[in-house]
Amino acid sequence: VVFQIQWAAYLLNSPILSMSGNETSVVYIPFLRKFNPMDSITIRGNLVDCLQRTILPVQMEVRNGKIAAVHSTESSNIDPNLPYILPGFVDAHVHIESSMLIPSEFARMAVVHGTVATVSDPHEIANVCGMEGVQFMVENGKKVPFKFYFGAPSCVPATVFETAGDAIDAEQVKALLGMPEIKYLSEMMNFPGAIAGDEEVLKKIAAAHALGKPVDGHAPGLSGEGLVQYIKRGISTDHECFTIEEAREKISLGMKIIIREGSAAKNFEALIPLIDEYPDQIMFCSDDKHPDSLVEGHINALCARAVAKGYDVFHVLRAACINPVNHYKLDVGLLQVGDAADFLVVNNLKDFKAEATYIDGVLVAENGQTKIQRFIDNINPVNRFGIQQLDVSAIALTANGVYPYPVIGCIDGQLITDKLDLHPAIQDGFYVSDTEKDVLKIVVVNRYFSAPVAVAFIHRFGLLGGAIASSVAHDSHNIVAVGVDDESITKAINMVIACKGGVSCVGRNKEQVLPLPIAGLMSAEDGYKVAEAYTEIDQQAKELGSGLGSPFMSLSFMALLVIPNVKLSDKGLFDGEKFSFYA
């Protein structure tokens, strides 16, 4: 990469060259609240223009954080000796909270992979802390040179069938949408309400439309007349498609499809053929991505996989860079003169490994290392946790003799579950876990106040010993736990309670917990250290027998009622097809 830095007015406590006459000295410019971009940078490389579908060797000038000029060289052929300059990657739908990191730490890791912006739905923290939680995300995101674009959570709480920490009504949604940092109405999970014309739902949608802001969808499996009515409400996207047929139907009715590949839900393989079929209507997202996955890659990894399968590189980059910017009207540059200087530099168009990432002309990552310093001052640990330690008797379930028993069928890599009718084991008059049949006890505990514990059973989780628990439990974020015996389950839950949030694992000879004191969802610690700690506890869960790709992430979705078929809330076992509790 050829960089000619003529003057730098920004740096995060790292050295730059100061040139005065014939003297050159190393100076340090302290951390600034406002990130002043480099005054002038000249970069030579093969510029990938996704709008014109061209790749040309150029000399690009950046001044005051903008693309000031792009000068073509004498040759119109790609120069193999130069790197490629691409628009920055955008994650088109992500819950930052699922990374277990506060926004400023998420940014430090994401820029290493060429990500310059996210379309972020803060409904996880909103379900715990309401408006205060949304404000926390917005303010913390401003601390670093990264482009966080947040949505106004549309469904807090997600349903009336669970206990959340707060609620956000239509008037509060309207107030949020009036903020410049809030770019859209977040996923409308209450698609039955939207279809039926629920007054509160329609008020929220109308508030977004009045300001010209898009409305995100959430409609897994919805088709036919119900889908038609849902889209007629002005809902423009969906990231919940599990089959290509479902996605094609939604596209035919005017929706844009966001291909999701997260730590739990993985729909890339099923949906990637859409990239060449509908290049203007496809985006990429992670939705929910744990910190260990973020260390490995982000949107760049999806680009690499798509190109390796033979899909058109310009179509791939449209999904990763262009379409989110256009759809959500983001202030993210697309390498046109006058645009914000948001771009990355790569050595090839195969692995998309970012050699350097720039945001508003600021070098934020280079050679696999973040250039963004940690922001550690004045972090307010917003949280709501109101329960005491649990006694083992609280999760005992008396056998009532009713057979068969409805059991959650866990599916690795998916958020949907199977509805199974199985026979849990009975011991001394109580239903208990059965490791031989892989039918384990699953528990959801109300974290906000003392209440009866909800108990059910889950198949295909795979634990052979111990238990795991988490206060990350979509969407109300009560405590969810699964295990092979009541003592281990209770111990894992109490470890989470003691930290006022976190993930825990109780094994035969080892117990560990990763504290998440910010809303019981996030840590303010260094993101890479959190990723290390999470990798260790995730590995312990797998050593206990779980064959799931991400046991904690899968567990966190077993309480998500808005995705069928069978889930467990703090109020009981829920039938996602009938949208009611089991009797």
Regions found by a protein language model. Give the residues of each.
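Short, ordered loop/turn segments at secondary-structure junctions
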Residues: 122-125, 153-154, 190, 220-221, ...
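Divalent-metal coordination cores built from histidine and acidic residues
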Residues: 107-214, 513-515
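Active-site microenvironment of metallo-dependent hydrolases
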Residues: 23-58, 62-63, 68-72, 111-113, ...
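Residue-level marker for buried hydrophobic side chains located in beta-strands
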Residues: 88-90, 284, 482-485
